[in-house]
């Protein structure tokens, strides 16, 4: 395999086929999540370096948070853009293994990587750098949930469970009858006899 074919294969990564049985995502979510992940990784590494430089103020927790944030940025960059690490052979295999896993795995991984630096050293650098990684995890979580069902499917499911309003089981004339069971109306009886009117 030539060097040009290797680069082309790595850059074609967003066009790879969706896994069988997984939810189909719109193109803007698929490419947007990758782009957000790349930008998040870059800023996480940059602001992690800023937190590491806080050793000047003798803040060990910010030093550790910066190191964790830089490692998180590196991991996100490896998984989202393995073409940035052409010199490391194992990167493409790791990215393929994670791509084969369900979307919620990647969402949970990104959210778990983003939280510790924020709690260890709360500041703009850790909040922005790790916050972008957390946002990438949130986008992957939305992609893992899949598309919303059509209106007809939701209406049919509501009628099967008896909440449809015009189903066969105990249909009433009031549309809100199935929302709250055993609800009592409010009564306005006036002031209590022992009230001090304060």
From Swiss-Prot:
Q: What InterPro entries does its record include?
A: TVP18/Ca-channel_flower
Keyword Nucleotidyltransferase included in the entry's annotation: no
Q: Which GO terms describe its biological process?
A: bulk synaptic vesicle endocytosis; cell competition in a multicellular organism; clathrin-dependent synaptic vesicle endocytosis; photoreceptor cell differentiation; positive regulation of neuron apoptotic process; positive regulation of presynaptic cytosolic calcium concentration; synaptic vesicle endocytosis
- Marked site, Calcium ion selectivity, at 80
Q: Which domain of life is it from?
A: Eukaryota
Cell compartment(s), UniProt: Cell membrane; Cytoplasmic vesicle, Secretory vesicle, Synaptic vesicle membrane; Presynaptic cell membrane; Endosome
Q: Which GO terms describe its molecular function?
A: calcium channel activity; identical protein binding
Q: Give the record's membrane topology.
A: Multi-pass membrane protein
Q: Which GO terms describe its cellular component?
A: cell projection; endosome; presynaptic membrane; synaptic vesicle membrane
From the record, give the transmembrane residue ranges.
36-56, 67-89, 114-134
Q: Which UniProt keywords apply?
A: Calcium, Calcium channel, Calcium transport, Cell membrane, Cell projection, Cytoplasmic vesicle, Endocytosis, Endosome, Ion channel, Ion transport, Membrane, Synapse, Transmembrane, Transmembrane helix, Transport
A Pfam family cross-referenced in the UniProt record is Cg6151-P
Regulation of protein activity = Channel activity is inhibited by La(3+), which reduces Ca(2+) influx and thus inhibits it's function in promoting activity-dependent bulk endocytosis (ADBE) in response to high stimuli.
Q: Which function does this protein serve?
A: Transmembrane protein which mediates synaptic endocytosis, fitness-based cell culling, neuronal culling, morphogen gradient scaling, and calcium transport. Regulates synaptic endocytosis and hence couples exo- with endocytosis. Controls two major modes of synaptic vesicle (SV) endocytosis in the synaptic boutons of neuromuscular junctions (NMJs); Ca(2+) channel-independent Clathrin-mediated endocytosis (CME) in response to mild stimulation, and Ca(2+) channel-dependent activity-dependent bulk endocytosis (ADBE) in response to strong stimulation.
| Subunit and interaction comment | Homomultimer. Associates with the dally/ magu complex.
Record family assignment: Belongs to the calcium channel flower family.
Name assigned to this protein: Calcium channel flower
Protein source organism: Drosophila persimilis
């Amino acid at each position: 395999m030539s060097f040009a074919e290797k680069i082309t294969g790595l850059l074609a990564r967003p066009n790879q086929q969706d896994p069988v049985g997984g939810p189909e995502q719109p193109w803007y979510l698929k490419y947007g999540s990758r782009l957000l992940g790349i930008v998040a990784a870059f800023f996480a590494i940059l602001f992690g370096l800023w937190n590491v430089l806080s050793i000047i103020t003798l803040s060990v927790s910010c030093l550790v948070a910066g190191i964790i944030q830089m490692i998180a940025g590196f991991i996100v960059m490896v998984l989202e853009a393995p073409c940035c690490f052409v010199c490391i052979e194992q990167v493409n295999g790791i990215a393929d293994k994670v791509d084969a896993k369900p979307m919620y795995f990647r969402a949970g991984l990104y959210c778990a990587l983003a939280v510790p630096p924020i709690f260890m050293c709360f500041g703009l650098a850790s909040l922005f750098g790790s916050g972008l990684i957390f946002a990438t995890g949130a986008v992957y979580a939305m992609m893992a949930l899949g598309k919303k069902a059509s209106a007809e499917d939701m209406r049919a499911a509501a009628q099967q469970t008896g909440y449809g309003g015009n189903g066969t089981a105990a249909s009433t004339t009031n549309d809100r009858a199935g929302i709250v069971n055993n609800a009592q109306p409010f009564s306005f009886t006036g002031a209590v006899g022992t009230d001090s009117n304060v």
